[in-house]
UniProtKB/Swiss-Prot annotation:
One GO-annotated biological process of the protein: lipid A biosynthetic process
Catalytic residues (positions): H49
The protein's name: 3-hydroxyacyl-[acyl-carrier-protein] dehydratase FabZ
GO cellular component, one term: membrane
EC class: lyase
Gene encoding the protein: fabZ
């Protein structure tokens, strides 16, 4: 549904911090999104986390979920970063890690809009690999005008 070219229109992140490779489902009416991150052994973070037993850092899994949520927020408002608005990841609730993400895994990212109040948006997010939960959290983002 969204290729990397279109994703780059909705996320200000760039290599090595752009963590969404593809969006396959985006349902504005039901306020949810499904996106993917293909985890390659060539990711720069594997050089130090951990060279002999590479594991994707948990904070980057959270960031990937937040980026998927950001795309959903922009699409819900029919806006883009180029319009002068950004969403900053400002917190999480109910955060849980369930298993490690390894080189070669395909991370499935899902986000559902829960609520917004005074430019603070909350999303229910989860990440899975091969149908197994690896991370879940309520992600909180702040909308900011540039």
């Amino acid at each position: 549904m969204m290729d990397i070219k279109e994703i780059r229109e909705y996320l200000p992140h760039r290599y090595p911090f752009l963590l969404v490779d593809r969006v396959t489902e985006l349902d504005i009416e039901n306020k949810n999104i499904r996106a993917y991150k293909n985890v390659s052994v060539n990711e720069p973070f594997f050089n130090g986390h951990f060279p002999e037993h590479p594991i994707m850092p948990g904070v980057l899994i959270i960031e990937a979920m937040a980026q998927a949520a950001g795309i959903l927020a922009f699409k819900m408002l029919d806006s883009k970063p180029s319009d002068g608005t950004l969403y900053y990841f400002v917190g999480s609730d109910k955060l849980r890690f369930r298993q490690p993400v390894l080189p070669g895994d395909q991370l499935v990212l899902e986000a559902k809009f829960l609520s917004s109040k005074r430019q603070i948006w909350k999303f229910e997010c989860k990440a899975t690999v091969d149908g197994k939960a690896v991370c879940s959290a309520e992600i909180i983002c702040a909308e900011r005008k540039l």
